[in-house]
Amino acid sequence: MGKGGEDCGNKQTNSSELVKSDTFPAWGKDVSECEEKFGVSREKGLSTDEVLKRHQIYGLNELEKPEGTSIFKLILEQFNDTLVRILLAAAVISFVLAFFDGDEGGEMGITAFVEPLVIFLILIVNAIVGIWQETNAEKALEALKEIQSQQATVMRDGTKVSSLPAKELVPGDIVELRVGDKVPADMRVVALISSTLRVEQGSLTGESEAVSKTTKHVDENADIQGKKCMVFAGTTVVNGNCICLVTDTGMNTEIGRVHSQIQEAAQHEEDTPLKKKLNEFGEVLTMIIGLICALVWLINVKYFLSWEYVDGWPRNFKFSFEKCTYYFEIAVALAVAAIPEGLPAVITTCLALGTRKMAQKNALVRKLPSVETLGCTTVICSDKTGTLTTNQMAVSKLVAMGSRIGTLRSFNVEGTSFDPRDGKIEDWPTGRMDANLQMIAKIAAICNDANVEKSDQQFVSRGMPTEAALKVLVEKMGFPEGLNEASSDGNVLRCCRLWSELEQRIATLEFDRDRKSMGVMVDSSSGKKLLLVKGAVENVLERSTHIQLLDGSTRELDQYSRDLILQSLHDMSLSALRCLGFAYSDVPSDFATYDGSEDHPAHQQLLNPSNYSSIESNLVFVGFVGLRDPPRKEVRQAIADCRTAGIRVMVITGDNKSTAEAICREIGVFEADEDISSRSLTGKEFMDVKDQKNHLRQTGGLLFSRAEPKHKQEIVRLLKEDGEVVAMTGDGVNDAPALKLADIGVAMGISGTEVAKEASDLVLADDNFSTIVAAVGEGRSIYNNMKAFIRYMISSNIGEVASIFLTAALGIPEGMIPVQLLWVNLVTDGPPATALGFNPPDKDIMKKPPRRSDDSLITAWILFRYMVIGLYVGVATVGVFIIWYTHNSFMGIDLSQDGHSLVSYSQLAHWGQCSSWEGFKVSPFTAGSQTFSFDSNPCDYFQQGKIKASTLSLSVLVAIEMFNSLNALSEDGSLVTMPPWVNPWLLLAMAVSFGLHFVILYVPFLAQVFGIVPLSLNEWLLVLAVSLPVILIDEVLKFVGRCTSGYRYSPRTPSAKQKEE
């Protein structure tokens, strides 16, 4: 299994002397030092006894499963919310009071228990949803485990053990890796079995291509991309076989560190800006409710506690428990009125509707609160590969030889995908390809192991993306006889297949790092055997002695032509193009009769890769191509849109600096001629910057290349500390910690790993950066609509509080009972509030800077407006209650048809003294099909008899809130300029809410539950007459608001943050 094992063949280092690779950098030591440190021989591997000892020290090679939160703790966490705690307290108190409901309480039987039961139901549903979301949070860690290898081929006790469970590996184990294997642990490459080894580790490091590995040690301070002699757990071998030494297992591997970082990031997840505002609102509401409830109760102390003064001292105290309980119930009703119970449900509904809108734009929301957070995004940290670019290598330039020596021809190649029909070659000689171009096409098609297939309407590569791009180029070049329709549904690579039929491949000289080229021998249809070579331009050119001209003739490669080719190569490299050169020659004389048979004498030369350089000599150079991972077509405009919207774009990539800079210039992150020396840093360079926050505050775009997971996390952490709202994109395992830490984690739906998706808040179905920008615009629109219905619901609650407070202050019977207020808050207000989520977005929504994350939901002016509206609601609901008791008519509307008795306002305000009134009598009155008579106890007229007045109050409240929802269409815009039909859903919602109110009014059973009765036509006219003025009042307030907006708001300048500091 390789050489060099004799030095340490019988050595076994004491297990306790082993150290983690953090202190022993295996990548910085040669192979013999590593074997000695881990006490192992490549030929024998570890002994069984030594494996057992190391198992005790290092444990199993698997990722830790964090202790899950107990279901009891999860339930308790759901009540760690101010609004929820207020609701819980109100429910408990209401439940207790239901048992002690006195004669003056008025609520009997089932009605008394409806309120607490409904509140408990709300809390239970809220808790279930919360627990479900919490249990989904650990899926990122579970997905991470799926990446781990399940089995490994290991040398133990001198015997090769196939299919050993990978979890049983320990540091020091000798493992054999073959093509297609998933790497089971972090390992040092100690010997190559094949001539070359390539590993796909982009999901861990962010590199766009498979990386060649070597046995040679590297600098001890190398970053993860620079550790060319290491292979990492979870990555995949795509080419070659090798022998490795396990250096780290389990949580000590790179993927284990990612696991730890995800756990750490999950512990630091913050509430969304809206949740913070609602929590603050809840805390303020708690204090206000407490004060008002206490005030209401104290105002009415005189009704249940009295005393006489004797000799200047209070004596003969009289206390009525029933009345005390009754007024305490009024205080509880006030609490119920003040709490917007329906708000959580409406917010969830609006966010859910927002997810549907975003899904139509290919943005799949995984976590509902992220919909709102998107709207205040100030910085987008984007990965390059696959997000800004297509992650599909494409040829962008083709350089061929000219008609005479010392001349070159250059062709620009369009297209950004593996679709052969995507773009064309500019100025291409269709149907009349010269001999030089034919040779380039032949080499690109045959010296190639990749394939392109059509899957689900998309073209995907099988094999190396670079080679797939070459085959796509061949299809765009067409065929000499004029066959240019390269692709069809059943035959994607027609031209490549035709070349393969004409030139039968008989041998392959595999790529290796030393000669940096690949060659194939072909048996041509012309009867000649040729060697076709592709590889690094400098290396292929160095082994070339001739060049092929346009007409197919060859000339000796002189220094001028060599310099011309190298200069063109240099110019293309400045554009971050990866260049591949093409050459050919007649096969060496030893292979003149070779047909691929293993019995041929020349076949032995092919078994030794050291012979390949001599075989690939005396070549004829024919041309070269420049390839790249091209930027997506929509990205440049999307980045310009971000700039207009006040959102900064930072590119954070694991790719090399020059490639990333070229892409950033092309897509508009940087200007073409801009000095970016202070804006483009590697991850390591950024970590060495003294004032990192100041660096991140630079206006315009920033680039961080060769970035490791820790660099991404640090950038996100610093931005969040500086008050930015950060959206982070990523697709790899290495991105997961930063995705979890960011305010908005955005994963790629097509190329993204399951780990990245599970750690994210948003998944892009099309992997397209421009989709993020569209989602941000949608998020802003949703937030504006949420702000509209939150303000609407809060203003409604202010009105209810004002109504109850006025009732208590005036001393009249309570106009509305808690169950009625609960119905209004949960059901009646729900449809209009939800419909406000359908308000059309502002046309200039992406031309405004992002709102501040601490932007107030309710400004002082808005609060004043709703206090005015709330006061009117209180006056209207209490006023209609008083009108029914004290007037036969109002505004010409006859109210005497039901035959109820009139009382004076003084009697109504002192109804508690009714029993002391001499000769007080009331007439029976009708409500619907019921007749109410109070002959036995006339004082019941102010309790059971208030049912009609209470119905009027409730109906006025419902009607005002419906009309007030029209006011909420726009913060300052008049209904004249923004009429109700701009949102037809709102008109439908108003009809639904009125319909629901009619149901509880006119269905006898429900009317009994809610303590109301049907209203006559005249009574409905009274309701409308009292309710409609709310529109006029708010129109006046909006007009004042428009006139004074310049005084109340000032624009936020770009330097605002610096001034604040």
From Swiss-Prot:
The active site is at residue 383. It is a multi-pass membrane protein. Its EC number is 7.2.2.10. Its main location: membrane. Residues 1-21 are annotated as: Disordered. One of its GO terms (cellular component) is endoplasmic reticulum. The keyword Protease does not apply. One of its GO terms (molecular function) is ATP hydrolysis activity. The keyword Metal-binding applies. Mg(2+) binds at residues 731, 735. Residues 1-70, 136-278, 346-786, 838-857, 971-983, 1039-1061 are cytoplasmic. Ca(2+) 2 binds at residues 336-337, 339, 341, 825, 829. Ca(2+) 1 binds at residues 797, 800, 828-829, 961. Belongs to the cation transport ATPase (P-type) (TC 3.A.3) family. Type IIA subfamily. This magnesium-dependent enzyme catalyzes the hydrolysis of ATP coupled with the translocation of calcium from the cytosol to an endomembrane compartment. This is Calcium-transporting ATPase 4, endoplasmic reticulum-type. It comes from Arabidopsis thaliana. The gene is ECA4.
